[in-house]
Amino acid sequence: MAGLKVEWNDWCPGCGNFGILSAEQQAIQELGLDPKKVVLVSGIGCSGKIPHFIRLPASGVHTLHGRALTFAIGIKLANPSLEVIVNGGDGDQLGIGVGHFVSAGRRNVDLTVIVHNNGVYGLTKGQASPTLKLGVKTKSLPKPNINSDINPIALAISSGYTFVARGYAYDVKHLKEIIKKAIKHKGLAMIDVLQPCPTYNDIHTKEYYDKRVYKLDEDPSWDPIVKKPEEMDDKMSKAILKSMEWGDRTPIGIFYQNELVSTYEQRIAERSPSYLDNPPAHDVIEFEGKPTTDVEDILKERRVT
């Protein structure tokens, strides 16, 4: 893992991002992924720095606020051989980017989305994020939160994500295994990571979560995997119901997994059989610094003199 580490970072001491970063680094290493084929994409926020803090030959893309998923989908569809991982905060993915978050579920592109869920906008001094519950007042808020919250698990499942899980930033070993399963899953995977923010959220602290989280896989009766089509509705309903548990006990682990749904790449390949062998990223677009497509004749007809 040492080869993936950088020598510096500028997160606050105790930030949950450290656990997510470590779990991600270990997952990439243990899966034996080709570093040249791993692309990290992030939005704006404290989580947006993840591509800077994992050393990869292809590095990553630090994109616009709320637009990480759209960049990631474009990268994956242009070159489906790449392993694309998105990191975004709860505000980035479920606030300004929530339209893209929902729309992505319809396509089921084969990539992984990691949502850093700390209940606040940490980079801009702790305003309430979309996952903070109505009436909760953190130390950074002058008054209790005036908005209701979004349930990331339920939203992802109802939007069409085919792998939906939750991890806890301070349980790195467990989170690492979830990330590995999400990456290996064929389809769109979302991991909601409970991430304490010691600087701005004094409610959902390490002590708060340590007493409450429990692992779904410790229940032998819990089976989130859809094995045949007729199981889908029942598994989805149970997963959404389970995601409503909050307070004294908060579940972490895999809520829902369904590999019976075709990926977007497979759907494209059905219409364009050469797609996977010759994706858009392999197209020659320039020669000796000049574009291979000449639009001069087209523009001549539209030139105004």
Curated annotation (Swiss-Prot):
Entry binding sites for thiamine diphosphate: 44-47, 65, 91-92, 122-123
Cofactor(s) needed: [4Fe-4S] cluster; thiamine diphosphate; Mg(2+)
Keywords: Iron, Iron-sulfur, Magnesium, Metal-binding, Oxidoreductase, Thiamine pyrophosphate
Source species, domain of life: Archaea
Residue sites binding [4Fe-4S] cluster per the record: 12, 15, 46, 197
Alphabetized SUPFAM superfamilies for the sequence: Thiamin diphosphate-binding fold (THDP-binding)
Entry keyword annotation includes Manganese: no
Cofactor binding: number and manner: Binds 1 [4Fe-4S] cluster per subunit.
pH dependence comment: Optimum pH is between 7-8.
GO molecular function terms attached to this record: 2-oxobutyrate synthase activity; 2-oxoglutarate synthase activity; 4 iron, 4 sulfur cluster binding; magnesium ion binding; pyruvate synthase activity; thiamine pyrophosphate binding
UniProt: Mg(2+) binding residues: 90, 118, 120
Task performed by this protein: Catalyzes the coenzyme A-dependent oxidative decarboxylation of different 2-oxoacids such as 2-oxoglutarate, pyruvate and 2-oxobutyrate to form their CoA derivatives.
Subunit and partners: Heterodimer composed of an alpha and a beta subunit.
Listed name of the protein: 2-oxoacid:ferredoxin oxidoreductase subunit beta
